[in-house]
């Protein structure tokens, strides 16, 4: 079973994420850790720090890499003939984003005033740019892409929808990078990440419906 170059790059990014976590584990002073916020069984919100939470993102990154590398092979759904560049870019971009997220959380553990959302927003913008640049090259397939009833039914609708959505993702990525540079409020940046990520996909789904009805 041949492992792609994208999977090896992703594995390196996973190792780097694990290295950041290990370094923080050994370097952080006693009692320090990643800030945590959760809703308890008592119905109240709780806040604290957790040293063990340092390992959550490296674990998630490893799971993503293994799932995206071997999942399609075990299910018999190969992507090499349909969207090899897009699939590889998704793999690299997601693990890269998780590396940035881990690094920012570690920085926050050392400095309570560090703004986690700004670098995460800009990294998400880069992810949208990277994936959007390759989205239009994906051919119709059941594994990766914007799968709506209309794109799966008509290759022409698939191609036009993915070119449109790819351009929208590039615009969203550029906007998110700019907002990450300009804004400081974490709530606003969180909303911007959600909007810039979801809007291109929603616009693409609506576009596929319009294209299908034009045929």
Regions inferred by a protein language model and the residue ranges of each:
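Ordered, amphipathic secondary-structure segments that act as subunit-interaction surfaces
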Residues: 69-116
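Membrane-proximal helix-loop-helix units in multi-pass membrane proteins
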Residues: 105-151, 155
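Active-site and channel-lining beta-strand-loop segments
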Residues: 24-55, 144-153
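Alpha-helical transmembrane segments
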Residues: 13-14, 47-63, 114-131
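Membrane-water interface of transmembrane alpha-helices
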Residues: 24-30, 63-75, 130-146, 206-211
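Terminal transmembrane helical module of multi-pass membrane proteins
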Residues: 141-213
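Hydrophobic core of alpha-helical transmembrane segments in multi-pass integral membrane proteins
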Residues: 11-25, 58-70, 99-102, 127-129, ...
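Select subsegments of transmembrane alpha-helices in polytopic membrane proteins
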Residues: 6-12, 54-62, 68, 87-96, ...
